[in-house]
Amino acid sequence: MLSRLGARALVCLAGVAMLAASGCALMPREPLVQMPTTARAEPRPIGPASGSIFQSSYAGNPLFEDRRPRNVGDILTILITENVNASKNSGTNTSRTGNAALAFDSVPRALGGLFGTSQNANINGANTMKASGGASAANTFNGTITVTVLEVLANGNLVVSGEKQMAINQGAEFIRFSGVVNPRTITGDNAVLSTQVADARIEYTAKGVIDEAQNMGWLQRFFLNVSPF
Protein backbone atom coordinates (compact mmCIF):
# COMPACT_ATOMS: atom_id res chain seq x y z
CA MET A 1 0.00 0.00 0.00
CA LEU A 2 2.80 2.39 0.93
CA SER A 3 4.68 1.57 -2.25
CA ARG A 4 1.63 2.45 -4.34
CA LEU A 5 1.23 5.76 -2.52
CA GLY A 6 4.90 6.49 -3.00
CA ALA A 7 4.67 5.75 -6.72
CA ARG A 8 1.65 8.02 -7.07
CA ALA A 9 3.45 10.77 -5.19
CA LEU A 10 6.45 10.46 -7.51
CA VAL A 11 4.20 10.63 -10.56
CA CYS A 12 2.49 13.75 -9.18
CA LEU A 13 5.83 15.39 -8.43
CA ALA A 14 7.08 14.56 -11.91
CA GLY A 15 3.96 16.09 -13.43
CA VAL A 16 4.34 19.26 -11.37
CA ALA A 17 8.00 19.52 -12.37
CA MET A 18 7.13 19.12 -16.05
CA LEU A 19 4.43 21.78 -15.80
CA ALA A 20 6.85 24.14 -14.07
CA ALA A 21 9.45 23.50 -16.75
CA SER A 22 6.91 24.16 -19.48
CA GLY A 23 5.86 27.38 -17.75
CA CYS A 24 9.45 28.56 -17.60
CA ALA A 25 9.95 27.68 -21.24
CA LEU A 26 6.90 29.67 -22.31
CA MET A 27 7.76 32.70 -20.17
CA PRO A 28 8.21 35.74 -22.45
CA ARG A 29 11.57 37.43 -22.38
CA GLU A 30 11.97 40.89 -20.92
CA PRO A 31 11.70 43.65 -23.56
CA LEU A 32 14.52 46.14 -24.06
CA VAL A 33 12.21 49.18 -24.07
CA GLN A 34 10.94 49.51 -20.50
CA MET A 35 9.26 52.93 -20.72
CA PRO A 36 5.81 53.78 -22.11
CA THR A 37 5.64 53.94 -25.89
CA THR A 38 3.32 56.95 -26.15
CA ALA A 39 2.33 60.13 -24.33
CA ARG A 40 -0.45 62.65 -24.75
CA ALA A 41 0.15 66.37 -24.79
CA GLU A 42 -0.90 68.18 -21.66
CA PRO A 43 -3.91 70.46 -22.15
CA ARG A 44 -3.07 74.15 -22.17
CA PRO A 45 -4.96 76.41 -19.78
CA ILE A 46 -7.41 78.69 -21.55
CA GLY A 47 -6.90 82.29 -20.50
CA PRO A 48 -9.33 85.15 -20.75
CA ALA A 49 -9.80 86.78 -24.13
CA SER A 50 -7.46 89.75 -24.49
CA GLY A 51 -8.60 90.96 -27.91
CA SER A 52 -10.99 90.37 -30.77
CA ILE A 53 -8.35 89.19 -33.31
CA PHE A 54 -5.04 88.45 -31.54
CA GLN A 55 -4.82 86.66 -28.21
CA SER A 56 -1.91 87.02 -25.82
CA SER A 57 -2.36 83.50 -24.44
CA TYR A 58 -0.54 80.47 -25.88
CA ALA A 59 -2.40 79.11 -28.92
CA GLY A 60 -0.25 75.99 -29.46
CA ASN A 61 1.20 77.02 -32.83
CA PRO A 62 3.37 80.14 -32.55
CA LEU A 63 3.64 82.21 -35.70
CA PHE A 64 7.44 82.54 -35.73
CA GLU A 65 8.43 79.03 -34.65
CA ASP A 66 9.41 75.91 -36.58
CA ARG A 67 7.62 72.58 -36.28
CA ARG A 68 10.38 70.72 -34.45
CA PRO A 69 9.23 68.78 -31.38
CA ARG A 70 9.88 70.48 -28.08
CA ASN A 71 6.94 69.52 -25.83
CA VAL A 72 5.57 66.33 -24.33
CA GLY A 73 3.33 64.60 -26.84
CA ASP A 74 5.08 65.94 -29.96
CA ILE A 75 6.06 63.36 -32.56
CA LEU A 76 9.41 62.73 -34.22
CA THR A 77 10.48 60.42 -37.05
CA ILE A 78 13.45 58.14 -36.40
CA LEU A 79 15.44 56.94 -39.42
CA ILE A 80 16.89 53.61 -38.30
CA THR A 81 20.23 53.10 -40.06
CA GLU A 82 22.15 50.65 -37.91
CA ASN A 83 25.09 48.81 -39.42
CA VAL A 84 27.44 47.14 -36.95
CA ASN A 85 30.39 44.94 -37.87
CA ALA A 86 32.75 43.50 -35.28
CA SER A 87 35.52 40.92 -35.44
CA LYS A 88 38.10 39.65 -33.01
CA ASN A 89 40.99 37.22 -33.38
CA SER A 90 43.35 36.07 -30.68
CA GLY A 91 46.11 33.51 -30.42
CA THR A 92 48.52 32.22 -27.79
CA ASN A 93 51.69 30.19 -28.22
CA THR A 94 53.84 29.58 -25.17
CA SER A 95 56.51 27.04 -24.29
CA ARG A 96 58.70 26.38 -21.30
CA THR A 97 61.55 23.93 -20.72
CA GLY A 98 63.48 23.25 -17.54
CA ASN A 99 66.38 20.97 -16.59
CA ALA A 100 67.93 20.27 -13.21
CA ALA A 101 70.78 17.99 -12.16
CA LEU A 102 71.61 16.98 -8.60
CA ALA A 103 74.66 15.13 -7.24
CA PHE A 104 74.92 13.59 -3.76
CA ASP A 105 78.18 12.66 -2.05
CA SER A 106 76.39 10.13 0.10
CA VAL A 107 72.89 8.70 0.11
CA PRO A 108 71.15 7.59 3.29
CA ARG A 109 70.61 3.85 3.51
CA ALA A 110 66.85 4.31 3.74
CA LEU A 111 66.84 6.11 0.34
CA GLY A 112 69.28 3.83 -1.38
CA GLY A 113 66.51 2.00 -3.22
CA LEU A 114 65.41 5.19 -4.92
CA PHE A 115 68.81 6.05 -6.40
CA GLY A 116 70.22 2.56 -6.97
CA THR A 117 73.91 2.49 -7.54
CA SER A 118 74.01 6.06 -8.89
CA GLN A 119 74.22 9.09 -6.65
CA ASN A 120 73.07 11.54 -9.31
CA ALA A 121 69.52 12.72 -10.12
CA ASN A 122 68.32 14.50 -13.24
CA ILE A 123 65.00 16.33 -13.53
CA ASN A 124 63.57 17.44 -16.87
CA GLY A 125 60.32 19.27 -17.59
CA ALA A 126 58.59 20.81 -20.58
CA ASN A 127 55.33 22.70 -20.98
CA THR A 128 53.77 23.83 -24.25
CA MET A 129 50.45 25.55 -24.90
CA LYS A 130 48.87 26.65 -28.17
CA ALA A 131 45.47 28.32 -28.38
CA SER A 132 43.59 30.39 -30.91
CA GLY A 133 40.14 31.92 -31.12
CA GLY A 134 38.06 34.20 -33.27
CA ALA A 135 34.63 35.78 -33.36
CA SER A 136 32.73 37.97 -35.80
CA ALA A 137 29.30 39.59 -35.92
CA ALA A 138 27.44 41.66 -38.50
CA ASN A 139 24.06 43.32 -37.94
CA THR A 140 22.09 45.58 -40.27
CA PHE A 141 18.76 47.23 -39.48
CA ASN A 142 17.13 49.83 -41.70
CA GLY A 143 13.66 51.25 -41.23
CA THR A 144 11.52 54.15 -40.08
CA ILE A 145 9.48 54.61 -36.92
CA THR A 146 7.66 57.61 -35.49
CA VAL A 147 8.06 58.18 -31.75
CA THR A 148 6.54 60.46 -29.14
CA VAL A 149 8.25 62.86 -26.76
CA LEU A 150 7.78 61.52 -23.22
CA GLU A 151 9.87 64.02 -21.27
CA VAL A 152 11.79 67.24 -21.80
CA LEU A 153 15.01 67.26 -19.78
CA ALA A 154 16.45 70.31 -18.06
CA ASN A 155 19.07 70.80 -20.81
CA GLY A 156 16.46 70.65 -23.56
CA ASN A 157 17.08 67.08 -24.69
CA LEU A 158 14.02 64.98 -25.50
CA VAL A 159 13.28 61.53 -24.12
CA VAL A 160 11.41 59.73 -26.89
CA SER A 161 9.80 56.33 -27.23
CA GLY A 162 7.54 54.62 -29.73
CA GLU A 163 6.21 51.34 -31.02
CA LYS A 164 5.02 50.06 -34.38
CA GLN A 165 2.91 46.91 -34.70
CA MET A 166 2.24 45.02 -37.91
CA ALA A 167 -0.03 41.97 -38.20
CA ILE A 168 0.58 39.78 -41.24
CA ASN A 169 -1.58 36.65 -41.64
CA GLN A 170 -0.95 34.54 -38.52
CA GLY A 171 1.94 36.55 -37.15
CA ALA A 172 2.57 39.96 -35.61
CA GLU A 173 5.75 42.03 -35.70
CA PHE A 174 6.76 44.69 -33.19
CA ILE A 175 9.32 47.47 -33.56
CA ARG A 176 10.11 49.43 -30.40
CA PHE A 177 12.47 52.37 -30.02
CA SER A 178 13.54 54.62 -27.16
CA GLY A 179 16.36 57.07 -26.52
CA VAL A 180 17.42 60.65 -25.87
CA VAL A 181 17.43 63.12 -28.78
CA ASN A 182 19.31 66.39 -29.03
CA PRO A 183 16.96 68.90 -30.73
CA ARG A 184 19.91 70.34 -32.68
CA THR A 185 20.24 67.07 -34.63
CA ILE A 186 16.63 67.15 -35.87
CA THR A 187 16.39 68.02 -39.56
CA GLY A 188 13.85 70.28 -41.22
CA ASP A 189 11.78 67.20 -42.12
CA ASN A 190 11.27 66.52 -38.41
CA ALA A 191 13.52 63.46 -38.56
CA VAL A 192 16.72 62.28 -36.92
CA LEU A 193 19.09 59.38 -37.57
CA SER A 194 19.15 56.58 -35.03
CA THR A 195 22.95 56.85 -34.92
CA GLN A 196 22.56 60.34 -33.42
CA VAL A 197 20.27 59.20 -30.59
CA ALA A 198 21.81 58.69 -27.16
CA ASP A 199 20.96 55.62 -25.07
CA ALA A 200 19.16 54.17 -28.08
CA ARG A 201 17.31 50.90 -27.58
CA ILE A 202 16.00 49.24 -30.72
CA GLU A 203 13.94 46.09 -30.54
CA TYR A 204 12.45 44.00 -33.34
CA THR A 205 10.41 40.99 -32.28
CA ALA A 206 7.69 38.82 -33.73
CA LYS A 207 4.92 36.58 -32.46
CA GLY A 208 3.18 33.85 -34.40
CA VAL A 209 3.62 30.42 -35.91
CA ILE A 210 6.99 31.30 -37.45
CA ASP A 211 8.34 32.57 -34.13
CA GLU A 212 7.06 29.47 -32.32
CA ALA A 213 8.71 27.20 -34.89
CA GLN A 214 12.08 28.85 -34.19
CA ASN A 215 11.86 28.24 -30.43
CA MET A 216 13.12 25.08 -28.76
CA GLY A 217 10.52 22.85 -27.12
CA TRP A 218 10.27 22.92 -23.33
CA LEU A 219 11.16 19.23 -22.91
CA GLN A 220 14.16 19.52 -25.19
CA ARG A 221 15.26 22.65 -23.34
CA PHE A 222 14.90 20.83 -20.01
CA PHE A 223 17.16 17.95 -21.07
CA LEU A 224 19.60 20.43 -22.60
CA ASN A 225 19.91 22.24 -19.25
CA VAL A 226 20.39 19.08 -17.14
CA SER A 227 22.70 17.33 -19.59
CA PRO A 228 26.35 17.38 -18.42
CA PHE A 229 27.63 17.23 -22.02
UniProtKB/Swiss-Prot annotation:
Coiled-coil features, chain-numbered ranges: none
Membrane topology, from the record: Lipid-anchor
Function of the molecule: Assembles around the rod to form the L-ring and probably protects the motor/basal body from shearing forces during rotation.
NCBIfam families linked: PRK12697.1
Family: Belongs to the FlgH family.
GO BP terms, alphabetized: bacterial-type flagellum-dependent cell motility
GO cellular component, one term: cell outer membrane
InterPro entries per record: Flag_Lring
Main location: membrane
Subunit relationships: The basal body constitutes a major portion of the flagellar organelle and consists of four rings (L,P,S, and M) mounted on a central rod.
Source organism phylogeny: Bacteria, Pseudomonadati, Pseudomonadota, Betaproteobacteria, Burkholderiales
Disulfide feature: none
A molecular function (GO) term: cytoskeletal motor activity
Residues spanning the signal sequence: 1-23
Localisation per UniProt entry: Cell outer membrane; Bacterial flagellum basal body
Name listed for the protein in its UniProt record: Flagellar L-ring protein
Matching HAMAP family: FlgH
Lipid-binding residues (covalent, N-palmitoyl cysteine): C24
Species of origin: Cupriavidus taiwanensis (strain DSM 17343 / BCRC 17206 / CCUG 44338 / CIP 107171 / LMG 19424 / R1) (Ralstonia taiwanensis (strain LMG 19424))
Annotated lipid attachment (S-diacylglycerol cysteine): C24
Keyword tags: Bacterial flagellum, Cell outer membrane, Lipoprotein, Membrane, Palmitate, Signal
Any Pfam family the entry gives: FlgH
